[in-house]
Amino acid sequence: MARPNAADVRSLSDSDINEQIDGLRRELFQLRFQQATRQLANTHRFKEARIKLAQLMTVQSERQRSTAS
């Protein structure tokens, strides 16, 4: 999973961002579950998912702040 740059994330619609955030949260839950049961082989997926989630949430909060002003 390649990390998107900021321009790619900002070009997404609000609904796409929300869908991706939900998907990444589910993925992180599954990764934690796999790690707890010792089934996880690729631990680097944690970092990738967290970084992508942070990027999406940052853009989402920027949009919320700009509409509130």
UniProtKB/Swiss-Prot annotation:
This is Large ribosomal subunit protein uL29. Keywords: Ribonucleoprotein, Ribosomal protein. GO terms for molecular function: structural constituent of ribosome. Disulfide bonds: none annotated. GO terms for biological process: translation. The gene is rpmC. It comes from the Bacteria. Belongs to the universal ribosomal protein uL29 family. It comes from Synechococcus sp. (strain CC9605). InterPro entries: Ribosomal_protein_uL29, Ribosomal_uL29, Ribosomal_uL29_sf. GO terms for cellular component: cytosolic large ribosomal subunit. The keyword Ribonucleoprotein applies. The keyword Ribosomal protein applies. It holds the Pfam family Ribosomal_L29.
